Amino acid sequence: QTCALPICFQKNDFGHEKNLSLMLQKMLIEMQITPKNISFLHLNNGPARFTAIRNCHALMKGFFFGHKVKIFSYKIFEHYFLGINQSFQKNILCIIDTNRRDLAIQKLSPQGKLIGKIKTYLIDNQLIELLSGDYVLMGNGIEKLKKIKDYSFIKKKLMGPIELKSNYFINNVYQKKPQGKFPRIIYPYSPV
């Protein structure tokens, strides 16, 4: 058992959501933050692993219960787009590792607008054909492909980022209108 401030934490085998709520509680007490101190919130609403994102949304809803906050909601692909530090004239393919045998791919315009729907692709010739098109690439799925010899050509098409960072919200301005309510969570990608 470890004690920090007035809260005592016991070693536990809770899921990540319990540990996250304890860390959030400790941070709020140490930094003396209340909902009144926060005027807007940047929120990734998926798609992602549903349990993780659902738990994070539940914690945020509880924290802001009874308090108004402006919410800027981003899909995971838009979050990656915020990490771009140069402009391009080509459309972008954001490639997300689904932690299965496929990858989720979303097309974006050079301005970061989503084009069409998310599609999942097996790592095969159909994916090679798609990635050979006139696109620049970003997303964490690139790490999986870089290890495969048949995909060595993608190194020339990378424009980053290949990992998500929360400071992308600080570094870039993206044309989003704030909402007053928490958005619906986008369910995970459909498996192939």
Give residue spans per PLM region.
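N-terminal beta-alpha supersecondary unit
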Residues: 4-47
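Oxyanion-binding and handling regions
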Residues: 4-6, 17, 72-192
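Short amphipathic alpha-helical face segments that pack within enzyme cores
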Residues: 19-22, 58, 79
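DPxDG-like acidic metal-binding loop motif
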Residues: 40-76
